[in-house]
Amino acid sequence: MISLESQVLERHLHLFQDKSILFAGGINDDFPQQIRQYAKSTDIWSWYFDYARTQSAVSFSVVSDKTADLIVYYWTKNKAEVQFQLMQLLSKAQVGQEVLIIGENRCGVRSVEKLLAEFGEVGKIDSARRCGLYHFQLQKIPHFDLNKYWKIYESEILGDLNVYSLPGVFSANELDNGTALLLSTIDTHIFGDVLDLGCGAGVIGAYLKKQNPKTKVVMTDIHAMAIESAKRTLVENQLEGKVFASDVFSHIQNKFDLIISNPPFHDGIDTAYRAVSELIKQAKWHLKDGGELRIVANAFLPYPDLLDQYFGSHDVLAKNGKFKVYSVRA
């Protein structure tokens, strides 16, 4: 089953005929494989490891150095992410580069005309499945400097810890309330091997490492920008730790004394529980005897039942009007 966006693109297969094509953005299906019979070649650039690991010929990286006759960009709801990716792609292109931009109307794809007007001609060529399809031709190559996209934030809660983040990373500009509540439960008595799963910019793992220098911290995420951000957060604060891509536990083999997380519950603009459900269901296999899983979540989410199902019972370490910090032990 292909996405609504790909269903619209399917109406325009003649545009792919005998061209080298680079797919980018929020693509999440196997449409590139399905059109290989029409195209000269297909490549995919994705920031999302959960997608990249299930598809062939996907480049999982912060920036792309690939070129193609036609770029097909899948719009996402994260405006900072879209702006970064399109500017980076166009900075590597030649004048005359053709781009198709497809996205759901509810994700704000209409704003593509304003975003790209300075750099060429853009116009809508189709509207269906609650999506808009736009054609763009490059006339002015944008300047792109990765360093200008870095954001740094501080917080009284974090002490002298500085957090570095790139576009598209959760809570990229400030410490969010859920993470702040989770950090309030971290003391100086944590030891051993620690996994910060879904690390984002690395604030949880870095804060924990700073409070407990003898711990061995591993941080993982599915988002390329999060991984790059977490690595820099560690380096800039002179902290040691391992950071790598993993779709929940897909690339994690070790067992830990503590698995800690502010897990995502938004997938695009829909609420999704897959990652959190997998985290809770599989955590016991990645905890040492007596090891702890500690997560923060919106109080309305049905995680207590799931925690009790797989661990027998749970404790609430902290709560406020919106969030709760849950703890279970293997």
Please provide the spans of the model-predicted regions.
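Conserved SAM/SAH cofactor-binding pocket of Class I
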Residues: M1-Q55, L175-S261
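A short helix->loop->beta-strand "cap" motif at the edges of active sites that frequently abuts
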Residues: A39-K40, Q94-Q97, K214-T215, G291
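Short loop/edge segments at beta-strand edges and connector loops
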Residues: S59-S61, F244-S246, A297
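Conserved proline-anchored active-site loop of SAM-dependent methyltransferases
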Residues: L70-A80, L197-G202, F256-I269
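N-terminal auxiliary segments of SAM/dcSAM-dependent transferases
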Residues: E81-E156
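A generic alpha-to-beta junction signature in SAM-dependent methyltransferases
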Residues: A93, I252, H286-L287
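Conserved Class I SAM-dependent methyltransferase catalytic core
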Residues: L100-G120, K124-S127, D270-R329
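SAM-dependent Rossmann-like transferase core, predominantly class I methyltransferases
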Residues: S127-D193
